[in-house]
Amino acid sequence: MNQYQRVAFYTLGCKLNFSETSTISRLFEDGGFAKVDFEEHPDVFVINTCSVTENADKKCKQLVKRAKKISPESMVIILGCYAQLKPEEIAQMPGVDLVLGANEKFNVLEHLEQKRSEIEQHHSNPAALEKATIVHDNIKHTHDFIPSHSYGDRTRSFLKVQDGCDYFCTFCTIPLARGKSRNASIDQTVIEAKKIAATAVKEVVLTGVNIGDFGQGGQENFFELTKALDKIEGIDRFRISSIEPNLLSNEIIDFCLTSANRFAPHFHIPLQSGSDEILEKMRRKYRSELFANRIAQIKSINPDACIGVDVIVGFPGETDDNFLETMHFLKDLDVSYLHVFTYSERANTGAPKLGTKVPMEVRRERSKQLHLLSDRKKQAFYQTQIGKTKKVLFEQEENEGFLYGFTENYVKVKTPFSAELINQIVDIQITEIDRDGLAKCLILANFAEI
């Protein structure tokens, strides 16, 4: 019988990490482990890390302390981007037993078994095992694409279609943490999606580091992938998680908004700055004019399409004028919400050398202003949806007697709780926006008849 019977997982960061954690958790379950919550005194903790910001690093350290407080005799395994970038730093954390780099995270069971053998061999000399075991290789040696998808954790599933990035933006460590851009073939990706179609999942979110780079300029590309996925029976919705504006072609936009049967009218597009001067310093592959054209193209086809935007404040050398340029650019854009990131210095990136360091209090103030703008944008978009008929996928989230879900164009809707509505796509009419900024709705059709 396996010495370690219960395993808990914690995922930091992006949807891609969630898809990989879910796949790794199934490896554990196939190996005889019971998956439990973090607080249920597991024998093994697996923490899948992010390293986009300094806060993500700090969160990992906090989780290790929390894990050892919950189960002092447990094994703590760290994997993910932080583990690839700074394995020695993690290994110095009290309580960490195993640190796995990018090439080894899907071999976690083998490394756990090896670690267990070492513990048994040195049980009379605990000092020999005080330092964590590191299994790590240079990211240049990471070439394989490992398919992943999430299942059982949420109403929707995250399907990994691409990994790595060749862009090397000056603020970003992801190419150092995940390696070169790579993917499976379209046929292999369709096979993975059909595994999800065989379950009760209604919505699949396509995820990766730079999904628009699918195919890396070869015979296959992201547009061809969307057309192939759209033909899969058994999945009601596909949603694109995030796509670079220079890779979001007009043919992708046209297909998703006019021809596709299953792709949601929702795009999340990273801008990062509305200042062309800052975009150049960031080594972004577009300028503000192209970004504005993409937004205009989407809205000209479907005014109800939801558009989310990533933006970074406090990039080195960002002046007040640069920030105001971003503010004014975003105010004039017909977008639905913003994801605002406060710039965080990252080791081995070029950004810190490109300009004067922006004081943290200035970064926070700029972030606050953009969050307020995002709230106004979202509220304005939601108001345009009142009276319209949409389809909502209700999720397993219950709070104070309400059930929540999202329309195809990503409006968050609430309705009085009914267990029968969970994981059902239901025709509704949006009736009002409440004080919490959520849409109330009228159920138009009995879900059992849909």
Describe each model-derived feature in a short phrase.
Residues M1-D213, K227, E251, F267, ...:
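Proteins enriched for Cys/Gly/acidic motifs involved in redox and nucleic-acid/cofactor modification
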Residues F33-A34, S74, D97, I235-D236, ...:
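A structural micro-motif
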Residues A56-K58, K180-D187, G215-E220, K281-R284, ...:
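Short, solvent-exposed loop/turn segments at secondary-structure boundaries
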Residues V76-I77, L85-K86, A198-D320:
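Conserved SAM/AdoMet-binding glycine-rich loop
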Residues I269, D310, L330, L338, ...:
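Hydrophobic, well-ordered secondary-structure elements that form the walls
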Residues K353-I450:
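Terminal RNA-binding accessory module
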